[in-house]
Amino acid sequence: MNPPPSAADSAHPKPKRSMWVFWMIVLVTAGPFVASTFFFYVVKPQGKPSYGQLIQPQRPVPALQLTTLSGKAVDLRKYNGYWLMIVAGPAACDKACQTLLFDIRQFFLAAGDDRYRVARVWLVTDSGPVNPGVFEPAEGTLILRAQPEQLKHWLPLAPGETLEGPIWLVDPLGNLMMRFPSNPDPLKALAVFKKLLYNTAGWKAKHLEPLP
């Protein structure tokens, strides 16, 4: 017969079990978004997506100096609640830049009924006139002028990489959490993005700032 637990044992439950109980309570009470994020980052083998790179630790959207093309100041943080797809590059926007804008537009369209949860952002890294040829592939995209030095401090780049190339994802909590490499494979990137939307389908923001 096993001896009854001592008073000391009762007063000090095993830490491992206590921590698991704590985290399960957090997952249940915090809602589907936190739970799905937990399983995407922690439970998935090796904690890696099938394509792209997780940004660890995540980087909250900082106070960037952003303006619309008409010069109105914009705080990107007010768009918390959306999945943000971000690309960057000079106003001249060459063929590769236009391809990126087209790709994120296709991602947006492929989101179907979840499109209202997605916002596309093009951060223009200079003060030059915007190439008029981009307005069609960038239709519906939030176009903002940005300070490239600020972006380099926030947006992670691979060795030898420039701002003009990757696609970055900001989650609805306002954290930069993933990047797709320069010249991304659009089909692979889309598959990962759709999985993120699916895994967070039950999470609804209390308020979504209307997009311009």
Predicted regions and their residues:
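Conserved helix-turn-beta segment immediately C-terminal to the redox Cys motif
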Residues: 41, 101-121
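Short, internal strand/loop/helix patches
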Residues: 119-170
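N-terminal "domain-start" segment that seeds a small globular fold
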Residues: 27, 31-34, 43-77, 99
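N-terminal Lys/Arg-rich, disordered targeting/topogenic segments
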Residues: 1-16
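Short active-site neighborhood of thiol/selenol oxidoreductases, capturing the structured segment around
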Residues: 77-104
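Thiol-/selenol-based redox modules, centered on thioredoxin-like
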Residues: 163-165, 169-212
